[in-house]
Structure formats: C-alpha cells, structure tokens
Amino acid sequence: MARYSLGLGLCLLVASVSAIPVDNNVEGEPEVECGPTSITVNFNTRNAFEGHVYVKGLFDQQECRNDEGGRQVAGIELPFDTCNVARTRSLNPKGVFVTTTVVVSFHPQFVTKVDRAYRVQCFYMEADKTVSTQIEVSDLTTAFQTQVVPMPICKYEILNGGPTGEPVQFATIGQQVYHKWTCDSETVDTFCAVVHSCTVDDGNGDTVQILDENGCALDKFLLNNLEYPTDLMAGQEAHVYKYADRSQLFYQCQISITVKEPNEECARPTCSEPQGFGAVKQANQTAQFFRVLKKRSAPVMENILDVRAELTTLEVLEGNLPSSLTQAQALVASREIGEDSFRQELCISSFHISVVTVFLGLTVFVAIFITYMIVSRMMVPSDKMQSAC
C-alpha cells in the first residue's frame, strides 16, 4: 500500500511541476501615448521582463518588435507608416482613428497562458474653429435657430454566403462571402453613400486596389461592381482568395457621404463591366494620411470616411469547413480525415476508461458467480446418489 501511495505522490508532483506557468504578468492597464507621428505603448510587469513586445502577425519584422528586457517595464513605439498600423477617417466623431494590436509575450520563444494581446486605438479629433470679428449691427436683429444633423456612422462587414449571413473572421479559398457596407443615420432620406477607393493588403505593405476612385471594380475575379439596395447600403458577392504566402487580408475602403436632394434618387457610379486581372498595385499612402491629420483644405474631402474589414484565409482547397470556424469569434474546431479521424473517434477519457473497466469487472464477477451456483446445484443430486448406494 505504501508503494502505491509513493507512486501516486510522485505522479502528482510531476503533474504540478509541469503545469507551472511563467512567473510574470502585466500589472494594471497599459499606458498609451498618442503622438503626432507614432503610438507608444508601455506595460508594467510584476517581475523583470525577458520576453517580446510586438505587433500581432509581424513578429518576424524587427522594426515591429521590441526585445529589450531586464526591467519591470516593457513597451514599443510604432510609427504610423509601419507595422500595419490602421488609419481610418471618421465623420461621426470627426477625426482620424489609428489602431493596432500589440502582443506582450513573456516567453522568449513561445506564446503562453500569461501572455496578453491589446487592441490599441488613438483618436485624433478635428476641431472646427470659428473666427469672428466685431461689426456694427442695427437695433433689430434676427434670431437664427440651427439644428445640427449628425453624420452617419458606417461599417464594413464580410458576411458568410449572402447579405443576411453572419460576419466571418475565417474562411477557405473559394468560399462565397458577401462584402457589405452599411451606414446608420438618425434621419431618413437625408444622406447618400457611395463606396470607392477600396484596397486589400497583406499587412506587410503589399497593397492592391480593387475599387477605383469612382467606385468601379477593377478585377471581376476579386470583386465585381457594387450593388446599392438602399441609399446607405452597398454590397457584392465574392469568393475568398489570398496572397501566395500570407493568410491575412486587410480591406480598406472610402465612403463618400452626400446630402440627398429632395424627391431625387441618390447618384450612383456608372461603371462598365470590369475585366479580369485588372487590380492595381499601389504604393505607400502615408503622406496622404499625414495631410488628413491637419485641417483639410479641399472641400471634397470633408465628407469622406474610411472603413476596414479583416479576414483570415485558410488554405483548404477541398472539403467543407466546419460552420463553427466560419462564425465570428468562433473556436477553430476542424477534424482530420483518414486514420487521424478514426483515432479521434476511438479516443475516450481516463474517467470513461475507469467506468468501463469497473463495469466489465462486475459483469465477469456476476457471470462467474452464476456459473458456480449452476454447477453446484448440478453436483448435488449425484452426491446423494452415491450416498444411497
């Protein structure tokens, strides 16, 4: 009995040692500094930091990773023009959002349970200044009452299958999805929306334009000309594709908001049928972003906003993807085929094995007991006969 207890104690000791996490973690909330040309994120750690701080998906790029350690502070500074920092203009509220996702990894080589990922966002507000001067007015003045109508709030979604599908984060090559742009307004029949200047990039600077400045499609194999079911909605079906060596796709589009004329329809782009392979590779547009941080000088830019959507493409060319994987924020639960699937179906837990073993043992014991009783009863008459003789 002592031998079994010692063995059990050793097993528990080994299990407890193997389950020890990294002895460090983030203390409190991260400190974010929104600078004129960069975002700085700092973290306080419980013990001296010996890991990495990097932009999600860009660990291999040295400029997007900070490996400094030895102190109880970790952080990284990210310029706007590097590391896939997202920049989107907004009309409500009016300004520019700068967004990125930063990962704090405490192990030098692997991601562990104590690591954390933070979505960091800075907002640069545009302020309209009113300049006035003193003038003479007559005794009779006219009072003006102005009601400000808020601008629409727009979003870009990639849905599964069609316009009523669920948003997707993961998809396979060739899967049918629906690109949908929607603007919500507090008023009815007041605004018109036109989607244009759409690009897709891999998060590593390889940007391709798929809708031109007029809102016309450039490559029918990537995205066809958009349809406008309502004044503030646009959409089009498409099939999922990916870059040759990158799984993530980052879409960004511009939406122009105009005031709708009474008793008239919203103006829509007049586009010809797009040709195949007409997508245009673009250069870095950082200079344009820095201009929008200042007061825009061109009136045409005043009512243009940016929207973004992301999609992770899985390179599965055959077979169907489980529905749980295509839903937003769902767990990845794919199954292997062939022998792996057969082994997975036969795999049961240790608890179930114990229950089955006990049940089989009881069954064998009962069977032996019944057999013994039957044999005993059959032996009784023969013994009596021998006694009589």
UniProtKB/Swiss-Prot annotation:
Residues 376-389 are cytoplasmic. Disruption phenotype: RNAi-mediated knockdown results in shorter and fatter dauer phase animals (dumpy phenotype), which have no alae. RNAi-mediated knockdown results in a folded pharynx and intestine in some animals. InterPro entries: CUT_N, Cuticlin, ZP_dom. Its main location: membrane. It comes from the Eukaryota. It is a single-pass type I membrane protein. Residues 33-278 form the ZP domain. It is found in: Cell membrane. Keywords: Cell membrane, Cuticle, Glycoprotein, Membrane, Signal, Transmembrane, Transmembrane helix. SMART domains: ZP (SM00241). Residues 20-354 are extracellular. The chain crosses the membrane at residues 355-375. GO terms for cellular component: plasma membrane. PANTHER family: CUTICLIN-3, GH04558P. This is Cuticlin-3. It comes from Caenorhabditis elegans. The gene is cut-3.
